[in-house]
From Swiss-Prot:
Pathway: Cofactor biosynthesis; NAD(+) biosynthesis; NAD(+) from deamido-NAD(+) (ammonia route): step 1/1. It is an enzyme of class 6 (ligase). NCBIfam families: nadE, PRK00768.1. Deamido-NAD(+) binds at residues 147, 180, 187, 267-268. This is NH(3)-dependent NAD(+) synthetase. Belongs to the NAD synthetase family. Mg(2+) binds at residues 56, 172. Transmembrane segments: none annotated. Catalyzes the ATP-dependent amidation of deamido-NAD to form NAD. Uses ammonia as a nitrogen source. The lineage of its organism: Bacteria, Pseudomonadati, Pseudomonadota, Gammaproteobacteria, Pseudomonadales. Keywords: ATP-binding, Ligase, Magnesium, Metal-binding, NAD, Nucleotide-binding.
Length: 275
């Protein structure tokens, strides 16, 4: 492990590889305890999370549901509950996966907010967008989608006196692969510190459908490239990112890409600058 790898892994509080199944189970329990303690300490009773159909939201959603079920059993307070939210932009091309995820998560309550009208309405009011190339405009509007989804989730949470869960984990955090004040905004991030294959391992252990566990990750924000794989955007694979974060050898090219991207996206992981 290079000094830079160690520095980045420490900054992201990366969880070491699971030594065995017992370590995996212990990590699941630790994260459920974190969710339960966060709720109890907040004095609130409701969790809210957008479900996309990917492995990250599937895993975080199931952990959230299990946590509120345990809280109800432990406290006798039936007000603890989890709201899973679908946030499509018009019709999602992999809606079947989102529905499979919802079925697996088995949330106490489900809600749907189609963000298309809000995204279009805002985009039409911002004249600066019309000056951009098609590709640049598509990228900017992709970030608008992520931020509108954040607004919707926090609106639901506010209406129910709840907290918003985020799905960020170490393999995305190191690449800054989230929208600032969009999907990066949340009250608690129960997958933090995990690398991608650890998220998959937790999902599999919890019983998630295999096609969701192994699904190709995509942010799916761009109209010109629907379903664009994360790894294509990264320029490296999740296997390489995971190996880097766990201090293992990666190619010189992968190492340089990860370090360069980490440095370039530092602003996403920090609080706003002040004088």
């Amino acid at each position: 492990m290079s000094n830079r790898q160690a520095e980045i892994a420490a900054a992201l509080d990366v969880v070491p590889p699971f030594a065995d199944d017992a370590a995996l189970v212990a990590e699941i329990e630790r994260r459920k305890t974190f969710i339960k303690n966060t709720l109890k300490q907040s004095g609130l009773k409701v969790l809210v999370l957008g479900i996309s159909g990917g492995v990250d939201s599937t895993t975080a959603g199931r952990l959230a549901q299990l946590s509120v079920e345990e809280l109800r059993a432990e406290t006798g307070d039936t007000d603890y509950r989890f709201i899973a939210v679908r946030l499509p932009h018009n019709t999602q091309h992999d809606e079947h996966d989102a529905q499979d995820s919802l079925k697996f998560v088995n949330a106490d309550e489900e809600a749907t907010v189609n963000i298309a009208a809000s995204v279009i309405g805002l985009s039409e009011q911002v004249s600066h967008l019309q000056q951009l190339s098609d590709a640049r405009r598509d990228f900017v509007i992709g970030n608008v989608k992520a931020r509108i989804r954040m607004v919707a989730q926090f609106t639901i949470a506010n209406a129910n006196n709840g907290l918003v869960i985020g799905t960020d984990h170490a393999a995305e955090a190191v690449m800054g692969f989230f929208t600032k004040f969009g999907d990066g905004a949340c009250d608690l991030a129960p997958l933090s510190g995990l690398v991608k294959h650890q998220v998959r391992a937790i999902a599999a252990h919890l019983g998630a459908p295999q096609h969701l566990v192994q699904k190709t990750p995509t942010a799916d924000l761009e109209e010109l490239r629907p379903g664009k794989p994360d790894e294509e955007a990264h320029g490296v694979t999740y296997a390489e990112i995971d190996a880097f974060l766990h201090g293992q050898n990666v190619s010189d090219e992968a190492y340089a890409t990860i370090v360069r991207t980490y440095d370039a996206t530092r602003h996403k992981r920090e609080l706003p600058l002040v004088p």
